[in-house]
Amino acid sequence: MKVVELPGFQRGFAKLPKHLQEKTWYQLHTFLEHVGSPVKPKSLRLKKLPFGNFEVSINMDLRILFQLHGDALILVLLGDHEDVRRYLRR
């Protein structure tokens, strides 16, 4: 699967401390291992959101907002719950 990072994700990722960057890649790797599987690990806290968006939790405060288009995983945003809500309101 091809992974595409949009600027909103890149900005959020650059602001994170090293340990959260590592946790972010770990969660993405875990998600990619289970794409197409009917069972996803509960630790991902995967949610389907409006407009073809999905959300995966990094920790209790941090979320990845993404979209799936064919064989591409589009990483849209990395931020807290309020950042995700603001993005979805647009």
Ranges and model annotations:
Residues 30-56:
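A short, surface-exposed loop/turn module that caps and links secondary-structure elements
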Residues 2-4, 11-15, 21, 56-90:
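Enriched for short, Lys/Arg-rich terminal
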Residues 4, 8, 14, 39, ...:
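Basic nucleic-acid-binding interfaces
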